Amino acid sequence: MMNSIFGKRKTPAELLRENKRMLDKSIREIERERQGLQTQEKKLINEIKKTAKQGQMGAVKVMAKDLIRTRHQIEKFYKLKSQLQGVSLRIQTLKSTQAMGEAMKGVTKAMGQMNRQMNLPSLQKIMQEFERQNEKMEMVSEVMGDAIDDALEGDEEEEETEDLVSQVLDEIGIDINQELVNAPSGAVAVPAAKNKVVQAEATGAEDSGGIDSDLQARLDNLRKM
């Protein structure tokens, strides 16, 4: 009811904005007056020079006094403009301070709401579950990496073994051919070499079985987590 009769009450921000607008307007008017006085000053100086050349010293003294008053007025306008600019700067500082206060008020309110919504036991449970799953993921990655390394290492060893066996058999084959010419009984070296190869392959199979068993055990442990 009171607002409808006397009008809506202005906020401090609105009052500061209106006062700053009035100050800025006054500063512009003072600046125009000062520029006008400076133009008048230049005209007086020219008139004084012209009158002095004509020898009219009485008129020169009168215009000189007018020039002094004009310069004093220009100086006053400079001071007044500086003072108004200082007040305008203070108003702007107040507006900035008020805006910062409102922002801090909003931030504080939001932080309070967030803190009230936080459930510390639930957060602790989430973090514990995250740590458990992260640890499990690291173990899975480690097991998979070891499995890949073992598989690649087995392939490399198998390839190297095959190359070595081929080289040995070639050498044995050459010896066998030479011994077949000289002594037929030397051919018995081939089965022995083959038996060694078979034994090596059996040993490799047993080692591979051990690796597979170890990998399976680690995977079983992960499933229990």
UniProtKB/Swiss-Prot annotation:
Alphabetically ordered keywords of this record: Coiled coil, Endosome, Protein transport, Transport
Cellular component GO terms held in the UniProt record: ESCRT III complex; late endosome; mitochondrion; multivesicular body
Domain of life: Eukaryota
A Pfam family of this chain: Snf7
Outcome of substituting A193T: In strain: cv. Edi-0, cv. Lip-0, cv. Sie and cv. Bur-0
GO BP annotations, alphabetical order: intralumenal vesicle formation; protein transport; vacuolar transport
InterPro entries given in the database record: Snf7_fam
Family to which the UniProt record says this protein belongs: Belongs to the SNF7 family.
Record function comment: Component of the ESCRT-III complex, which is required for multivesicular bodies (MVBs) formation and sorting of endosomal cargo proteins into MVBs. The ESCRT-III complex is probably involved in the concentration of MVB cargo.
Protein name from the UniProt record: Vacuolar protein sorting-associated protein 2 homolog 1
The organism of origin for this protein: Arabidopsis thaliana
